[in-house]
Amino acid sequence: MMSRRLGFAVLLFAAQVGSAGATGLATCDSGPQSGWQSEDILRKQLTERGWQIRRVKIDGGCYEVYAIDDKGARVESYFHPVTLQHVMTSKR
């Protein structure tokens, strides 16, 4: 009986950790994707600011952007998909 409870606890923990996003750097409480702004709008806004976009993907419910910013730095930035508000940036 004890090993069954332990097994269940391990599965529950793994499910929670797995849903936190691949990197865990940022999470966005973004709701269903039907309410998100398009990736193309984000790309356009960042390009107009002088960014060179390399890749955009979804991670932790956020748009995760790999780019060269307007200062020439390689960055990994997260944006809320509903508001397109900047969440965080890390230099690469």
Each predicted region: which residue ranges?
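Classic N-terminal secretory signal peptides
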Residues: M1-A22
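Cleaved targeting-peptide boundary
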Residues: A20-S30
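Short, non-transmembrane alpha-helical segments in secretory-pathway proteins
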Residues: D29-Q52
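Surface-exposed aromatic
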Residues: G60-E64
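Conserved histidines in hydrophobic membrane contexts and catalytic metal-binding motifs
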Residues: V65-I68, F79
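Glycine-centered tight beta-turn/hairpin loop motif at sheet-sheet or coil-to-beta transitions
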Residues: D70-G72
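A short, surface-exposed beta-strand/turn
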Residues: V75-V87
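Short, solvent-exposed mixed-charge patches
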Residues: S90-R92
